[in-house]
Amino acid sequence: PVCHKNKPIKIKNTFNPDGAGTVIKQDVSNPQSKAIKGISSINDTSLITVQGLGMVGVIGVNYRIFKALAKNGISVFLVSQASSENSTSIGVRNADADLACEVLNEEFVKEIEMGEISPIQAEKDLATVAIVGENMKHTPGIAGKLFGTLGRNGINVIACAQGGSESYISFVVENKSLRKSLNVVHDSFFLSEYQVLNLFICGVCTVGGSLIEQIHSQ
């Protein structure tokens, strides 16, 4: 009701009643605020890709995909499609992956038999990470900074998606890379430009001793 009537909600801390609190409202855009407001993740992701040259230029392929999944109660939280139209990737929970593959293989059984679409399988044990921020659409270079950070840290991005509202970017990585992804993305967007690093040096030989003297003289 408050959303439809455009009424702001103010949340106060009972242990700190004099604090400013948090205001939730519809219009929160502020050109001066940070582009990224938060990072979220889903650690039980399976990626299912429907692909084949028989999809190119064919109307209704995605409709059939989502209709078949919805009919079987399978929720999709990520969609990524190439501009060439020869593949569509969807993210589902690991628990839904086998059923999703089964219903999609049944839906496209004729196309698979004719070789127009490849047999549909799931890539399991992945994780989805999303960065969210209202000011992303006003800030150039967010995607470049994000994927540059991941690349420099040796994290492979399996799939990615961005909404037309430009308020979020989602990407899929291996589950083992989830914690590292969250850490490096957080450091890149939320820490200051200058960071304090801890350097550990072992050894007392000539090279090690000279290095320690140089550091001490700085």
Annotate each predicted stretch with a short phrase:
Residues 2, 141, 211-217:
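Ubiquitous "structural anchor" signal
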Residues 197-216:
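Glycine-rich adenosine-cofactor-binding loop
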Residues 1-195:
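C-terminal catalytic "cap/lid" subdomain
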